[in-house]
Amino acid sequence: MTANIHNHRILILDFGSQYTQLIARRIREIGVYCELWAWDVTEEQIREFNPNGIILSGGPESTTEDNSPRAPEYVFNAGVPVLGICYGMQTMSMQLGGDVEVSGEREFGYSQVEIRETCELFRDIQDSVSEDGKPLLDVWMSHGDKVTAIPADFVTIASTETCPFAIMANEEKRFYGVQFHPEVTHTHQGLAILKRFVLDICGCDALWTSAAIIEDTVARLKQQIGDDHVILALSGGVDSSVTALLLNRAIGKRLTCVFVDNGLLRLNEAEQVMAMFKGKFDLNIIHVEAEDRFLTALKGENDPEKKRKIIGHTFIEIFDEEAVKLPQVKWLAQGTIYPDVIESAASATGKAHVIKSHHNVGGLPEDMKLGLVEPLKELFKDEVRKIGLELGLPYDMLYRHPFPGPGLGVRVLGEIKKEYCDLLRRADAIFIEELHKADLYNKVSQAFTVFLPVRSVGVMGDGRKYDWVVSLRAVETVDFMTAHWAHLPYDFLGRVSNRIINEVNGISRVVYDISGKPPATIEWE
């Protein structure tokens, strides 16, 4: 057994920055376990967590307001290093006797910081050197307020032209404040700064690796489940697939997976899932072919939200029916990941593992009394993918573009019919195939085809045809909260259009969606 991968840990207190989860992901990349909590935690909770260091995140509030968030006083009395980032630096300064004011000159975007005094956090870290020999850092700023006076026992380490206290430090207490964001890639030395803080100043060892996570998770699953049986809804998506393989490694044939083919999957997806998990990995899988049942339930329904609810309810019904056939099952496994936990955690309650209802299978009969198994609940999506690779899942499967839970149910506009799904599957497969051939698939964040329930006249040979329209959609995004439409080459789009119209009998016109998010959403429904 490897060393306890949770022994060394960093606590990140969240003040609401859009980059806070990125801080946690960077710390994990360094190889150290960390957790992300709301800023208003209690002293008791911090003591119980026993971190090696604490990071105060940025945030949208102003420390000049009376009711703005503050770090718990215990943070500065815990005897561990503290790093304040942006708002975190400002509240650190304010709480320890410094001063913060609303700045007349806001800094958003690229800036250059000049390091004037040496300190352990920035020793030998620089991007360039000024004319008078001072180290310079290329950083990313995003702040309106600024520190105008640092606490008495702090030293000014660096400044910019408009920010006199860009970095401050109390080396004796190991307290550091930076006005910029080291967690974003625009701060070129950001990862080096975080490594220095976590590994050197906090004294953490890099124990958090994919191989160690697998070993630790399997051991904990064995301990939690014992000799019991587990049921899992396997979709073929990243989270449920990695969950299945971790459980398979821990308990083998005592895991039963239920794979429901709802008729709303991608071309040949059901066959691929069965070949992968039943064939290659020899998992115990119940394959439920339920296309007719789903399409019957959806017949005549045009409203997108009602379609989603019908699909979800029908899935739960089928899963329940299969689950009650397995009286030996004592546990329900889910692919809940850490961002789900973060979103669900109630502020200052300590209930960090309350899961949102839409992530649960839900609807199971109460008398089943199944325990919940969530092997991925500490992991970010990128960590889940790396573990999947380690477990033997193919790269192309793990790094596929996102596919919505309701599947083609939200990509066939209006009423869902088998004819529409079959046409859409074939058209979408051509689009994705051509993206791969042109080496464009990994250059866009998400690409798919939408079936439009309108007919358009077309000409084939000497005849006219009156067939359906599909829209191609491809976007580029970092976080899926906003997105730009992908500027795919015209000749590529022409090639895809020609193939779809010539090879998919029933489609006469192909259009390309050039809407950004906002105002449009990425999916059409």
Curated annotation (Swiss-Prot):
Entry-linked SUPFAM superfamilies: Adenine nucleotide alpha hydrolases-like, Class I glutamine amidotransferase-like, GMP synthetase C-terminal dimerisation domain
Gene3D superfamilies listed in its UniProt record: 3.30.300.10, 3.40.50.880, HUPs (3.40.50.620)
Class in the EC hierarchy, top level: ligase
Sequence positions that bind ATP: S235, G236, G237, V238, D239, S240, S241
Identification of the protein by name: GMP synthase [glutamine-hydrolyzing]
Lineage start: Bacteria, Pseudomonadati, Pseudomonadota, Gammaproteobacteria, Enterobacterales
UniProt subunit comment: Homodimer.
PANTHER family assigned: GMP SYNTHASE [GLUTAMINE-HYDROLYZING], GMP SYNTHASE-RELATED
EC number: 6.3.5.2
Role played: Catalyzes the synthesis of GMP from XMP.
Keyword Ligase recorded: yes
